[in-house]
């Protein structure tokens, strides 16, 4: 199947309900209401730092797409809104542009339309292991230059690769290759999951190679479900059945934040099933330093209401902070909270600090 059709399939399926699976467990986190906050809403300050750079909000636009005409149009709109609001933006996997120079423009529009905000380049883990160190360094340089990236993300998508008809489930040697990426990039390296979460054990290993971890937890967009839908369309009954069995595989985002924070003292980005500013505020209270959203912004972009979506998330974060008496993001991180039985049991069994 042509890669451009696959990319467009991902766009439409990711924006649909068929891709939304499970719960990220933010309903297991209750931020305690402060009836006497002793601040005005106008005093709430949501500015923060993204890997050292000051940004206007504690969230950014997560990795989504690139490589087709539709993807290029979406990336242009996302970049414009990121620039307008002063928030970071990731791009989708750039492998397609490295192999097909004629589609580089679908990523370069991000550099053009968001010149001043932090931009995050993106390469997939399976491709790292198959490249020589020299070729990998070349790819990293090109990916960074393509969007004038401030940081580069390496996405871990083992679960997707085993279901995807064109999948490449090759992960031997990836850890050492991330070291090559870090040396070649000369800028922050983010290691991220894409919907199945990161455990304490993996987080502790990433101390050596990552400047940040993006947990990419379970409970939102499921690439297993997306690939299962594609398999059904192509007539692959076996892959469809396997996807159905494994679509609930993963670490819920709320639990994955606790897992990552327990194994890694560096910068943590929350993603996966964050559907509101309140979800994002809960992620920050759990220990994340920043959060990203993808599906809500993709859907809003396709429906022509992207600015409203960003404004709504900003309002929700501010209100959550006001109602917990948190003037700053740092205050929010220490806001009193109560955990539901599933998350509390997970924390206790896994001996997590959260």
Swiss-Prot record:
Principal subcellular localization: cytoplasm
Annotated residues for binding of Mg(2+): 161
Keyword Magnesium: yes
Catalytic activity field: isopentenyl diphosphate = dimethylallyl diphosphate
Residues at which substrate binds: 6-7, 93-95, 160
GO biological process: one example: isoprenoid biosynthetic process
EC category name: isomerase
Pfam families: FMN_dh
Sorted UniProt keywords: Cytoplasm, Flavoprotein, FMN, Isomerase, Isoprene biosynthesis, Magnesium, Metal-binding, NADP
Cofactor(s) it depends on: FMN; NADPH; Mg(2+)
Residues given in the record as FMN binding sites: 63-65, 93, 122, 192, 221, 273-275, 294-295
Cited SUPFAM superfamilies: FMN-linked oxidoreductases
CDD domains registered for this protein in UniProt: IDI-2_FMN
Protein location: Cytoplasm
Known EC number: 5.3.3.2
GO molecular function (one): FMN binding
GO CC field: cytoplasm
Domain of life: Archaea
Disulfide-linked positions: none
InterPro entries xref list: Aldolase_TIM, FMN-dep_DH, IPdP_isomerase
HAMAP family per record: Idi_2
Quaternary data: Homooctamer. Dimer of tetramers.
Family assignment from sequence similarity: Belongs to the IPP isomerase type 2 family.
Entry function: Involved in the biosynthesis of isoprenoids. Catalyzes the 1,3-allylic rearrangement of the homoallylic substrate isopentenyl (IPP) to its allylic isomer, dimethylallyl diphosphate (DMAPP).
Record's protein name: Isopentenyl-diphosphate delta-isomerase
Species this chain originates from: Pyrobaculum islandicum (strain DSM 4184 / JCM 9189 / GEO3)
């Amino acid at each position: 199947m042509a890669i451009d059709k696959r990319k467009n399939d991902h766009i439409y399926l990711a924006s649909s309900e068929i891709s939304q699976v499970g719960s990220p467990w933010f309903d297991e986190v209750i931020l305690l209401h402060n009836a006497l906050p002793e601040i005005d809403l106008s005093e709430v300050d949501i500015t923060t730092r993204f890997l050292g750079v000051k940004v206007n909000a504690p969230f950014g636009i997560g990795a989504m797409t690139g490589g087709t005409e539709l993807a290029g149009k979406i990336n242009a709109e996302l970049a414009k809104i990121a620039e307008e609001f002063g928030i970071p933006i990731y791009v989708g996997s750039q492998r397609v542009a490295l192999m097909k120079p004629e589609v580089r423009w679908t990523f370069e529009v991000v550099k053009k339309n968001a010149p001043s905000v932090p931009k995050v380049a993106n390469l997939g883990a399976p491709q790292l292991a198959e490249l020589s160190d020299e070729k990998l360094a070349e790819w990293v340089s090109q990916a960074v230059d393509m969007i004038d990236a401030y940081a580069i993300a390496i996405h871990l998508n083992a679960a997707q690769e085993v279901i995807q008809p064109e999948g490449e489930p090759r992960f031997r040697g990836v850890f050492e290759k991330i070291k090559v990426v870090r040396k070649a990039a000369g800028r922050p390296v983010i290691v991220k999951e894409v919907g199945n979460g990161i455990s304490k054990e993996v987080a502790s290993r990433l101390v050596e190679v990552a400047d940040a971890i993006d947990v990419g937890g379970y409970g939102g967009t499921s690439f297993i479900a997306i690939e299962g839908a594609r398999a059904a369309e192509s007539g692959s009954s076996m892959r469809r059945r396997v996807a159905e069995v494994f679509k609930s595989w993963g670490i819920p985002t709320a639990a994955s934040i606790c897992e990552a924070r327990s194994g890694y003292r560096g910068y943590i980005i929350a993603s996966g099933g964050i559907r509101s500013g309140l979800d994002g505020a809960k992620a920050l209270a759990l220990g994340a330093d920043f959060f990203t959203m993808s599906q809500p912004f993709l859907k809003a972009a396709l429906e022509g209401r992207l600015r409203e979506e960003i404004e709504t998330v900003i309002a929700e974060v501010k209100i959550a902070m006001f109602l917990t008496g948190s003037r700053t993001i740092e205050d929010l991180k220490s806001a009193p909270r109560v955990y539901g039985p599933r998350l509390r049991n997970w924390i206790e069994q896994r001996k997590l600090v959260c």
